[in-house]
């Protein structure tokens, strides 16, 4: 499952002390591949040729993840809905604030959220690690709500924490209204801010490990024996040398 990619980071906007026992990937190329799993991608060949890529996105940015240098931008400071890229912040805070073996119970609010590819149900119990890994691989909206509720009691209070963290890392044009990115007029960001968040998150070795996996069998504590094979929605994992 260890994949390689280009040494650059790409973001496009569409429609600590905890002991984590896991193998952490140290290859920089593989780190950059993991970052690509969080966003829609630009055409790398166009960037390599130093030609302006012909993209249909209303706003986009390409940065060098190591230095933050902007390699390409289009309306990079325009406010847009960040959609599921929001989950980068949710996952990052979850890693920082929850032990990996914390037991997270799925509430009715989480289970009734739209778009649940993990098929979580009210009363299900998973470890924080399993829930976050599953969320980042298949972008489960209910999992994000469950994480928020476990940390702060409600998604609304957790959104306040997200905004505090955003200000801390310099995301000056961002406001979060929920933990999963569902459309809300008060939920917005810019390509520049999302690039800043991704660059910050990728410095966390646990986060990098979460987003680099191509697939994983997510297991439940309850119901006992329940599991689901989650496949990463980033189709470019492993396609670049």
Which residues are covered by each model-predicted region?
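Conserved catalytic neighborhood of penicillin-recognizing serine enzymes
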Residues: 114-145, 227-241
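Short, well-structured active-site flanking segments
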Residues: 96-109, 205-213
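Penicillin-recognizing serine hydrolase domain
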Residues: 53-57, 155-241
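Short active-site loop at a secondary-structure junction
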Residues: 72-93, 103-105, 126-134
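Beta-lactamase-like hydrolase cores
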Residues: 33-85, 100-102, 159
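Second-shell loop/turn segments in exported
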Residues: 74-80, 115-122, 130-134, 144-153, ...
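Acidic helix-start/capping segments at beta-turn-to-alpha-helix junctions
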Residues: 105-117, 184, 214-220
